[in-house]
């Protein structure tokens, strides 16, 4: 067991975890970008612009646009490791919401040709935000246990659809702007205080599933979905992450309800901020919850 598999685990900034996570786990990440009020920023965990400021500007009418990591940025990001003789396992944001995995694959091919014998593997997480982050963390746990790159890669491919992602939103403005809902639905939704409940399907796309009146009912429903789908129901003993776009009170309500219904959780529910890439599309007022679930593909496809 002395020969450690010499590889680096990397991911995109869109895992929406915090800086402490990356430092503690030694996971380098590559930043998406966004443009707001004519200025370009990296999606860098709230460094260049605080999350509060970012979401306040959207509330005041700013319309940020995002751009993914291109292949030359991936090459720049990975090449120093490959030069040192390290192999790379990269877990990417879902191909269902971004073309970034294609950029990663172009860079992978380029580097493996330039450095014969090097290995770069890319996993399409089919997830987003802290559910995607959860997949990365599980793989980091395996890496720390001494599993090889190949073992980690195979596990991620086999289990990535076992992460369940549910989102709800209390502010429909950005959804209307992004064309996810029609103007008519938007006005009706505002009138009736409707919160759409969305999830990720088996192709990693964000799909509206239910329309629920009032936030409180939506919070109850999102936890009911967890009871229905989590492995072992309320005896679920895995992790649960919650991500919010500047609506901490709502995230705490979900956390409290989850912790009261699931006494055997692994650690407490962890709350993170939705970063600027995903947040450019959701706007403020979105809460995302993720956990592992009972069955693999069947569950996501049943909702698809």
Regions found by a protein language model. Name each.
Residues 1-3:
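Short, Lys/Arg-enriched N-terminal segments with co-localized hydrophobic residues
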Residues 6, 14-22, 27-33, 38, ...:
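Mixed-charge interfacial surface used for oligomerization/domain docking
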Residues 8-73:
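N-terminal glycine-rich anion-binding loop in soluble enzyme alpha/beta folds
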Residues 11, 92, 244:
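Short beta-strand/turn micro-motifs composed of small residues
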Residues 48-55, 78, 83, 110:
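A short glycine/small-residue-enriched secondary-structure motif
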Residues 59-95, 102, 106, 153:
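Glycine-rich phosphate- or other oxyanion-binding loops that anchor nucleotides, phosphorylated ligands
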Residues 94, 126, 299:
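Short, flexible active-site-adjacent loop segments at beta-strand->alpha-helix junctions, enriched
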Residues 292-304:
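Single conserved hydrophobic/aromatic residue that forms the stacking wall/gate
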């Amino acid at each position: 067991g002395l020969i450690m598999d010499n590889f680096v685990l990397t991911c995109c900034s869109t895992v929406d975890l915090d800086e402490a996570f990356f430092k503690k786990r030694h996971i380098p990440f590559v930043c998406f970008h966004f443009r707001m009020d004519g200025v370009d920023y990296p999606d860098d965990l709230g460094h260049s612009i605080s999350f509060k400021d970012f979401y306040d500007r959207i509330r005041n009418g700013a319309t940020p646009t995002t751009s993914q990591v291109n292949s030359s940025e991936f090459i720049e990001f990975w090449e120093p490791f490959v030069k040192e003789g390290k192999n790379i396992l990269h877990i990417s944001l879902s191909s269902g919401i971004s073309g970034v995995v294609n950029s990663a694959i172009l860079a992978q091919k380029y580097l493996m040709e330039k450095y014969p014998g090097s290995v770069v593997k890319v996993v399409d997480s089919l997830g987003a935000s802290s559910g995607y982050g959860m997949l990365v963390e599980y793989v980091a746990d395996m890496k720390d246990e001494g599993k090889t790159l190949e073992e980690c890669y195979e596990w991620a491919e086999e289990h990535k659809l076992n992460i369940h992602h549910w989102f709800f939103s209390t502010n429909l403005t950005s959804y209307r702007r992004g064309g996810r809902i029609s103007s008519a639905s938007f006005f009706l939704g505002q009138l009736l205080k409707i919160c759409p409940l969305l999830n990720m399907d088996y192709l990693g796309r964000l799909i509206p599933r239910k329309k629920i009146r009032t936030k409180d009912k939506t919070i109850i429903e999102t936890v009911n979905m967890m009871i229905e789908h989590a492995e072992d129901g309320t005896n679920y003993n895995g992790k649960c992450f919650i991500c919010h776009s500047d609506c901490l009170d709502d995230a705490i309500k979900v956390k409290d309800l989850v912790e009261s219904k699931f006494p055997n959780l692994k650690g407490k529910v962890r709350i993170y901020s939705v970063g600027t890439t995903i947040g450019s599309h959701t706007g403020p007022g979105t809460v995302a919850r993720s956990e592992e679930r009972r069955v693999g593909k069947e569950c996501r496809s049943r909702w698809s």
